[in-house]
Amino acid sequence: MNIISVGVNHKTAPIEIRERLSLSEVQAKEFLTNLIDDGIAQEAMVVSTCNRTELYVVPGMPEVDGNYMKEFLISYKDAQGEVRPEHFFNRFYCNTARHLFEVSSAVDSLILGEGQILGQVKNAYRIAVEVQSAGILLTRLCHTAFSVAKKVKTKTKIMEGAVSVSYAAVELAQKIFSNLSIKKILLVGAGETGELAAKHMFQKNARNIVITNRTLSKAEALAEELGTNQVLPYESYKDHLHEFDIIITAVSSKEYVLTEPELQQSMQKRRLKPVIILDLGLPRNVDPEIGNLKNMFLKDIDALKHIIDKNLEMRKCELPKVKKIIDEELVGFAQWINTLKVRPTIVDLQSKFLEIKEKELERFRYKVSDAELKRMERLTDRILKKILHHPIKMLKAPVDTADTIPSRVNLVRNIFDLEEQNRLSK
């Protein structure tokens, strides 16, 4: 029994190729159904995100390998001539398990430690379950991957520290003010960056968030989504600067949207109560001279980038710990697979000796009393258990290579004259 993984990701293919092979949920369900119905796969799962489309397959036919699955996916997406085999990676057996463990643990992500991928893998497994393409092997593989990801998250710092500008800004504000729930926050700009910053603030329990934007309806839409319903007209928001403890700017502007005189006047009204200004604009939205004002803490993208770099370096230092967790779980998963592979032989071995026992006891059925026969049954059961203990233990023992398993199986089948000696390899 083997499991292969094949696909494209940010390491193997450019974005246009990844986009070309991306599968929607509807397509993924159809693709998996085709694999199972056509007998190509016994089990199958597809993980498809913006950065990867990866297939995890238990082959249903001898000719199904990585190259077969590459061509099948290319054909399904009608991408012949656009996508080449060298755009794909290919894994099999335990390397497939290792790859999924690394993906689920976010160490194979475009951004190291990016935790969103685990939810995407869980969604891929859900789809496989719904179309009944997840059997015993994929189910065990996925649940082990989920367990690995949980251990990595709780026992390492691989997912800690902001690695995006908007999140770094929020973390910095929390470090300075500690409790964001009691602070009043102004967001200038409701575009993608501003929206992310506002949502990160909300996740940190900030609730008093006021939004302003050149297009008022966009500010209102974001405020409604957050549940704050607090907006200011763009033309008049500067009249209220003194009311805010944190100001986040994220607008597209060639000129500064906040100048030193404006903030100096605001600070006088605040009686010099501290203010954090987080300038997420590019070009900068805030006059850098503002940073010289007393109790005014100004951080721009460069300052936040420094925080991000430190966090990424910290995450890289956690990689050996993650690798150790993955290695330990991989050993357990490999041993479980080996047990699956030898199970038919163990069943045959037990069945053969049980049959011998029944035949021999049958000879005494009418020669001894029922009580004596039961004692003989208990005695023979104990003898069989001791006889079979060593060969079964040997079959289940850990192996260094996959080739060891067939040789063990064949040895046992030959010694005990079991039928279908090549059952495992078939």
From Swiss-Prot:
The active site is at residue 50. GO terms for molecular function: glutamyl-tRNA reductase activity; NADP binding. The record marks 99 as: Important for activity. Substrate binds at residues 49-52, 109, 114-116, 120. It catalyses: (S)-4-amino-5-oxopentanoate + tRNA(Glu) + NADP(+) = L-glutamyl-tRNA(Glu) + NADPH + H(+). Its EC number is 1.2.1.70. Pathway: Porphyrin-containing compound metabolism; protoporphyrin-IX biosynthesis; 5-aminolevulinate from L-glutamyl-tRNA(Glu): step 1/2; Porphyrin-containing compound metabolism; chlorophyll biosynthesis. One of its GO terms (biological process) is protoporphyrinogen IX biosynthetic process from glutamate. It is an enzyme of class 1 (oxidoreductase). It holds the Pfam family Shikimate_DH. Keywords: Chlorophyll biosynthesis, NADP, Oxidoreductase, Porphyrin biosynthesis. Belongs to the glutamyl-tRNA reductase family. Possesses an unusual extended V-shaped dimeric structure with each monomer consisting of three distinct domains arranged along a curved 'spinal' alpha-helix. The N-terminal catalytic domain specifically recognizes the glutamate moiety of the substrate. The second domain is the NADPH-binding domain, and the third C-terminal domain is responsible for dimerization. HAMAP family: Glu_tRNA_reductase. During catalysis, the active site Cys acts as a nucleophile attacking the alpha-carbonyl group of tRNA-bound glutamate with the formation of a thioester intermediate between enzyme and glutamate, and the concomitant release of tRNA(Glu). The thioester intermediate is finally reduced by direct hydride transfer from NADPH, to form the product GSA. Homodimer. Catalyzes the NADPH-dependent reduction of glutamyl-tRNA(Glu) to glutamate 1-semialdehyde (GSA). This is Glutamyl-tRNA reductase.
